[in-house]
Amino acid sequence: MRKVGVLAAACVAACAAGASGFKVQSGYLIAAEQKSNSIVAIDARQAGAPAWAWEWKASRDPGIAKGDAKLFNAPSDCKADGDSVLMIASCGNFAELSLATGLAVCYGHVGGNPHSITRLPGKGMFATASSVSHSVTIVSTADNPFSPELQPKKAYPLTSAHGVEWDAKRNCLWALGHTNLVRYAWSETQFELSAVRDYDFRPVGGGGGHDLAPDGAGGYFITTGKCLVHFDPNAGEFRLVERLKDIKAYSPNKTWGNAYTTVRTVWWTDRIIVKKGDEERVIGPYPGVKFYKARWMK
């Protein structure tokens, strides 16, 4: 009877989120929304403020222990990853979410005001970046997907760590700090990161590294306190793209345009800006909403 009850609760939670059968869709954004402490999907193919197409909240997910739900407050990043979404919150927790069910597949805890997450090769392996603890942390959820206290983890120092991205082409992890971008080698068998090279972007972008995003062609965009910078891993060179202040997230897309969130109040915004060539459209405004980051799903 208990198993039936849990399944029923899961179905109710998924239906409440409007998530049943939802899939990654072109032209949709996934966003971290800090007023409701939720992850939401938005149809961004046209300007305006449509209703959420999908939503996840830890407090409505029966797989999240009641005492752990508050550690998902202040979601700070989210990324579509196959049929899942990876999310992390400034209060310390992260999760892999199923788009189809609207429920967590696994979750864990890293602390230190985490700002970014990426999947590593290997079952249930993740890397995170935390700005207050100045660290990149690797975590395995494989054996204990819903028990953060039992999950092995290792932390590596990186000043004001804000971004992490796995590079499948080069088989390495990139991590963004306050003034530098670090390349790490990953060993699944040893559960170990090894720093390979450190790139200083201050001559081009100044300090304040905040967001790290793939450009879709093998390179990366970096946002700093004052500008948008492009990094070419093959040449090991940074290039100034545009002077944009306080960009929390930047997400390029050749079809739909380049989406970004920028500070309007404290560190939030009630809208997402999308630019394609000389054209600009606004997704929003949503009065009272507190977007932190937003990224294209596809």
Give the label of every model feature segment:
Residues F22-Q46:
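An edge-strand/N-cap motif at the start of beta-rich repeat modules
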Residues Q25-G27, G82-S84, G122-G124, K169-N171, ...:
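Short coil/turn segments that connect the beta-strands within blades of beta-propeller domains
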Residues A31-K35, L86-C91, A127-V132, L173-H178, ...:
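Conserved beta-strand positions in repeat-built beta-propeller and related beta-rich domains
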Residues W52-A69, L103-G108, P148-Y156, A195-P203, ...:
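A short beta-strand motif characteristic of beta-propeller blades
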Residues W56-V85, A89-G92, G102-S116:
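Blade-loop segments of beta-propeller domains
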Residues K66-K79, G111-R119, T159-E165, V204-D215, ...:
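Repeated scaffold domains used in trafficking and secretory/extracellular systems
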